[in-house]
UniProtKB/Swiss-Prot annotation:
The active site is at D213 (charge relay system), H251 (charge relay system), S422 (charge relay system). Its EC number is 3.4.21.61. The lineage of its organism: Eukaryota, Fungi, Dikarya, Ascomycota, Saccharomycotina. One of its GO terms (molecular function) is serine-type endopeptidase activity. O-glycosylated. It is found in: Golgi apparatus, trans-Golgi network membrane. Residues 498-647 form the P/Homo B domain. It comes from Candida albicans (strain WO-1). Belongs to the peptidase S8 family. Furin subfamily. It is a single-pass type I membrane protein. This is Kexin. Its cofactor is Ca(2+). Residues 671-768, 798-938 are annotated as: Disordered. It catalyses: Cleavage of -Lys-Arg-|-Xaa- and -Arg-Arg-|-Xaa- bonds to process yeast alpha-factor pheromone and killer toxin precursors.
Length: 938
């Protein structure tokens, strides 16, 4: 048992508010202890946690609960403890896994049985997207004439605009005239086009952007008024105030100034200068994945946007992604943030472009939950440092061509050297503040839709743009274009929210093909035409997406396993059914790793708006331009679609731990079984009601078996391991109208196949086969006719004065239940009596109360069956429509007859006749209308 004091402490900690929990986290002793995270099933009770602490007391020390994730708890273990020999990740990251170490088998098995997952928490350091050094800035010269008359005229207009805006809004900030990203005086039009929104008083009111960075100088005169302390925390020094402490802790403050620098007389002005900023400090020292996860959702009820200008090192060598618990935290952010509308995560694409780096090798920027922002300079050109990839959604302004972003700095200074994609991300975050201020009801996916649909394409001659399914242009360099604040905000004002998210996972596609280059092999002239390419594809059907409730594509991901002797020489792309190409892996000359890609996920936003239906092709190829030996083994891959749901009411909550490929297979199998069950039941009913002899029933059952054997699951077919198809293309893409039609179509197909397979048979054999098929075909037509007559009788009412009335003897008929064939006019007087005898109005058998001898009942049944069959045959083959006044069966008018009977019983005989005449005239008109409707349908 746990000591009472410890038990009280644990319960008190778990019940304390979130802020108090952060304040109660004890200091970490990484020198003497290892830390790990345990996931326990404590959703309904804290007993599993209490039991775990009690059981492992003396082995592991309880530290604290992870506030960002339910059911996750931090423990520590002394580095000298023997359990360190097998302790590792379990149901978590796919490295440093738990090992069933010799001598600790029982300890291993026991620990695994107690927990749902274990995550090791080693120290790590995240890298800032630091501004590119000025001496390394690429100065791009173009053919623009800075001294031309047109340019002078344009700049004169820009100066006049600047003066007017400053006067109207009373702007006196000394650096405002140098903030070209707000009003570009030298290259007019190459700015974020925000001043029109300012004049409309759209200034970011009510929106808070968290700078997940190295701190924010909340004491700066340019920041203080717009600083939000509730959304702030220092994870490096464990405190409420995220003030910069190190000499290079200026990054977050500069980013904050871009967004929300106050309109005053200090430095410049923020793009959303009435919004607020908070600081979440994580980049000023080593942290663990639990700290990072906490940071990504800290102040989730306060912060709307999380601006992140950091990630793996931008050196063209690193392949890195967030740990599983960080991914879980981001999923929590988009599911629970902003009152369930979802927090907005904005990431800088990276500054490794000059090293050949790509943002698809960065698991933060290629997350579907991130808006990845690249950079353009003040001329609108693509800087060399800005990383391009298929995950880039938009670009906005930053340093390049000798110019930088002018913003607030630490120590009461102003900065004129802020740049890189780390300056582009907060500028975009400020624009998203304006968007949310104008329309706070947008979800996280709506913000991405607005980015895709209202960004402005730029440098169309440079970016290898492709036209997408939405008739939008997409470039790996520029995404869907630059952020035009005025255009995007006004687009967002009238935006109607999309339906909730849905997703599709394919099966894992085994490839296991190898490419090997040799020194003697001649190198190709272009990267896009390598001598060897491994091809694979997956066919996504309409049925696949429908069963998973997916209407259209937003993001696609490709999870791969590729072994390589030189990772930087591997290239990969995916081609959609519409022909849009996403470059997933590009060559990186500095990446000489031999680890390849192990369960690595690439992402693309280039296919936004596609249906997803059709063949998705992947190509893996090698850079053999060096003339040395490189080997690539493409083992397997999995294709995933994330998009809008068909039916929002059926939308689910995404769980990263679930295997949605297995769920899809289960749903398809369940639907298949239900379809078989429905078809079998319908076929059996048809055989019973239309066949008087045993031979007819056998024929119908046989036809049903034929249909069952020809139907196949229309799930995704894997091109690399193709199987023989058992259905025609029409069966795959056209819905089945009825069982009878299916039987007929199947029989026709079987007939055609039989003719092809038996070309050498004699004429007698062919005649016999044709005769059998003709009989079955006629029977199918009869069944169709029978069903059509039933439907007509079910849904078309007839007048109450017809000749055919319900008989009073109470006998039952299988085909037309509850109908009266009597010509008597006094049937209304006996309606209540007949209703008392009948307690069901369903088609089929009734619960009759009369006792009739078996022989009498059988004779009556046979007679009625013969009469009914003759009538059906006459009606079906008639050249004119029946007289609905006299010959139409009457279903569903019992209540009307009952009411008429009650009125007739109360009224005098003479008035009864008048009423009957009037009613008959009304019903004659109704019958004429019904007659017209039937003629139209026929």
């Amino acid at each position: 048992m746990l000591p009472i004091k410890l038990l009280i402490f644990i319960l008190g900690y778990l019940l304390s508010p979130t802020l108090q929990q952060y304040q109660q986290i004890p200091p970490r002793d990484y020198e003497n202890k290892n830390y790990f995270l345990v996931e326990l099933n404590t959703t309904n009770s804290q007993k599993p946690l209490i039991d775990f602490i009690s059981h492992y007391r003396g082995h592991y020390n309880f530290e604290h609960q992870l506030s960002s994730l339910d059911n996750h708890y931090v423990f520590s273990i002394d580095k000298s403890h023997p359990h360190n020999s097998f302790l590792g990740n379990h149901n978590s990251n796919e490295y440093n896994l738990m090992k069933r170490q010799l001598g600790h088998e029982q300890d291993y098995d026991e620990l695994i049985s107690h927990v749902e997952s274990i995550h090791l928490l080693p120290m790590k350091k995240l890298s800032k997207r630091i501004p590119v050094p000025i001496e390394m800035e690429d100065v791009v010269f173009d053919n623009r004439d800075d001294t031309g008359s047109d340019n002078h005229e344009a700049t004169d207009e820009a100066h006049q605009k600047l003066i007017e805006i400053a006067k109207k809004l009373d702007i006196h900030d000394p650096e405002f005239t140098t903030q070209w990203h707000l009003i570009n005086l030298k290259y007019p039009g190459h700015d974020v086009n925000v001043t029109g929104l300012w004049l409309e008083n759209i200034l970011g009111q009510g929106i808070v952007t968290a700078l997940v960075d190295d701190g924010v100088d909340a004491e700066s005169d340019d920041i203080k008024q717009n600083f939000n302390s509730e959304g702030s925390w220092d994870f490096n020094n464990k405190g409420k105030s995220p003030l910069p402490r190190l000499f290079d802790d200026y990054h977050g403050t500069r980013c904050a100034g871009e967004i929300a620098a106050v309109k005053n007389d200090v430095c410049g002005i923020g793009v959303a200068w009435k919004s607020q900023v908070s600081g979440i400090r994580i980049l000023s020292g080593p942290i663990t994945s639990s700290d990072e996860a906490e940071a990504m959702v800290y102040g989730l009820d306060t912060n709307d946007i999380y601006s992140c200008s950091w990630g793996p090192t931008d050196n063209g060598k690193v392949l890195s992604e967030p740990d599983v618990i960080v991914k879980k935290a981001m999923i929590k952010g988009i599911q629970e943030g902003r009152d369930k509308k979802g927090a907005i995560y904005v990431f800088a694409s990276g500054n490794g472009g000059r090293f050949g780096d790509s943002c698809n090798f960065d698991g933060y920027t290629n997350s579907i939950y991130s808006i990845t922002v690249g950079a353009i300079d003040y001329k609108g050109l693509h800087p060399q440092y800005s990383e391009a990839c298929s995950a880039v959604m938009v670009v906005t302004y930053s340093s390049g061509s000798g110019e930088h972003i002018h913003t607030t700095d630490i120590k009461k200074k102003c900065s004129a050297t802020h740049g890189g994609t780390s300056a582009a991300a907060p500028l975009a975050s400020g624009i998203y503040s304006l968007i949310l201020s104008a329309n706070p009801n947008l979800t996280w996916r709506d913000v991405q839709y607005i980015s895709v649909l209202s960004a402005t394409p730029i440098n169309e001659e440079d970016g290898n743009y492709q036209t997408t399914a939405l008739n939008r242009k997409y470039s790996h360099k520029y995404g869907y274009g630059k952020t035009d604040a005025y255009k995007m905000v006004h687009f967002a004002k009238t935006w109607v929210n999309v339906k909730p998210q849905a997703w599709y996972y394919s099966d894992i596609i085994e490839v296991n093909q190898t490419i090997t280059t040799t020194p003697e092999q001649k190198a190709p002239s272009k990267r896009d035409s390598p001598q060897k390419i491994i091809h694979s594809s997956v066919n996504v059907s309409e049925k696949d997406l429908k069963i998973m409730n997916v209407e259209r594509v937003e993001h696609i991901t490709v999870k791969v396993n590729i072994d390589s002797t030189y990772r930087g020489r591997v290239g990969m792309r995916i081609i959609s059914p519409t022909g849009v190409i996403s470059d997933l892996a590009t060559f990186r000359v500095n990446d000489a790793s031999t680890r390849g890609f192990q369960n690595w996920t690439f992402m693309s936003v280039a296919h936004w708006g596609e249906t997803g239906i059709g063949e998705w092709k992947v190509e893996v190829f090698v850079d053999d331009s060096k003339g040395d030996q490189v080997e690539i083994n493409f083992k397997d891959w999995q294709f995933r679609i994330f998009g809008e749901s068909i039916d929002g009411d059926k939308a689910e909550v995404y769980d990263i731990t679930k295997d949605y490929a297995a769920i899809r297979r289960e749903l398809l199998e369940k639907e298949k079984q239900n379809s078989k069950s429905t078809t079998t039941t319908s076929s059996t009913t048809t055989a019973t009601t239309t066949s008087g002899g045993e031979g007819d029933q056998k024929t119908t059952t046989s036809a049903e078996n034929k249909e069952s054997t020809t139907k196949v699951d229309n799930s995704a077919s894997i091109t690399t391991s193709q199987t023989a198809s058992l259905t025609s293309s029409n069966e795959q893409h056209q819905p089945t109208e009825s069982n009878s039609d299916s039987d007929s179509d199947t029989d026709d197909e079987n007939k055609q196949e039989g003719e092809e397979d038996n070309d050498n048979d004699n004429d007698n054999g062919n005649k016999k086969a044709n005769s059998d098929n003709t009989g079955f075909y006629l029977m199918s037509i009869a069944v169709v006719g029978f069903i059509a007559v039933l439907l007509v009788m079910k849904f078309h009412k007839t007048p109450g004065s017809g000749r055919r009335r319900r008989r009073r003897d109470g006998y039952e008929f299988d085909i037309i239940p509850g109908e009266d064939y009597s010509d008597s006019d006094d049937d209304e007087d006996d309606f209540d009596t007949r209703r008392a005898d009948d307690d069901s109005f369903d088609l089929g058998h009734r619960n009759d109360q009369r006792v009739v001898s078996a022989s009498q009942q059988q004779r009556q049944y046979d007679r009625q069956q013969d009469e009914t069959r003759d009538r059906l045959f006459d009606d079906f083959n008639a050249e004119s429509l029946p007289d609905y006044e006299n010959d139409m069966f009457k279903i569903g008018d019992e209540e009307e007859e009952e009411e008429e009977g009650q009125q007739s019983a109360k009224a005098p005989s003479n008035s009864e006749g008048n009423s009957g005449t009037s009613t008959k005239k009304y019903k004659d008109n109704e019958a004429d209308e019904d007659h017209k409707d039937v003629v139209g349908t026929q």
